[in-house]
Amino acid sequence: LMEPKILESVVTALLHTDFPETTHQGILDEVNLSGHVLPKQAVRDPHFRKSVMLAYEFRCAFCGYDGRINSRPVGIEAAHVKMHSKGGPDDVSNGIALCSLHHLLFDSGVLSLSDEVEILVSQYFLESDYDTPSSAMKLIGQLMRHPQPGYDLPAAEFLRWHRGNLFTEPARKRD
């Protein structure tokens, strides 16, 4: 195969250039490299997370999840709409607060948003049980929760980038 250090460098560069961080571990597992290459976390502006979380009041903009342990938010993350590695800024206009599940589905191309911030679900996404509380199918056609007054919705240019580069089209139609 390849020299381990070279392999790690190549894989790390590819992951950080072409894939959202939330998908790195799954990709490494899929190609049997999870024991050989450790995904490195990119350095981010800590103000981005704080600003996005405050804008969305520490709750998922898709489902409203707002779990806490000892008053500390858990399972809620600041997601970039346009990947940071593709020139997406660390700005609230490029961010959405999402629960861990919806962040992964958003970064994996399962979920996206229309210009009117209607939640889109890929036709290619399958679930075995649509009746579970966390079913992505329940989100089809719903409007995302807006940030609190004083904060803008995600910018249309970043939403279009997400749909054109990450979302697996076409979107499902509402029943």
Label every model-predicted segment.
Residues 1, 33-39, 142-147:
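Charged, low-complexity surface segments at secondary-structure and domain boundaries
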Residues 1-33, 116-122, 128-131, 136:
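Mixed-charge, low-complexity interaction segments
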Residues 6-7, 20-23, 48, 151, ...:
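Alpha-helical structural motif
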Residues 10-66, 82-93, 171:
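Short, charged surface segments at domain edges that flank catalytic/cofactor-binding sites
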Residues 43, 68, 72, 76-175:
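A detector for short metal-coordination/catalytic motifs
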